[in-house]
């Protein structure tokens, strides 16, 4: 995966998180209360301002929404 692919994947992932939150009619403030993450952390995760959110933050975010995050470590065989 090159840098462009990584940037696109990162943006899509963040957009999907925000879309799921919005589809559940949940505000960032409500998600903050449930997840224990600050509102600014949630905003930064969704907007990309936090360049590398911790796995712990992503798990807390997803758990609060009742969704699972699957991570495939490795690449395609070439």
Predicted segments — roles?
Residues 56-71:
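DNA major-groove recognition helix of helix-turn-helix/homeodomain DNA-binding modules
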Residues 15-34, 60:
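Short basic helix-loop element that most often maps to the first helix and adjoining turn
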Residues 1-15, 68, 78:
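N-terminal flexible/basic segments that precede or flank functional cores
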Residues 36-52:
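Recognition helix of helix-turn-helix/homeodomain-like DNA-binding domains
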Residues 16, 41-44, 57:
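Residue-level recognition of specific faces of alpha-helices
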């Amino acid at each position: 995966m090159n840098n462009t692919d990584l940037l696109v994947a990162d943006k899509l992932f963040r957009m999907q998180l925000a879309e799921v939150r919005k589809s559940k009619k949940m505000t960032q403030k409500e998600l903050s209360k449930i997840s224990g993450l600050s509102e600014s952390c949630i905003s930064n995760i969704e907007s990309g301002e936090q360049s590398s959110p911790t796995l712990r933050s992503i798990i807390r975010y997803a758990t609060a929404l009742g969704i699972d995050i699957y991570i495939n470590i490795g690449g395609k065989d070439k």
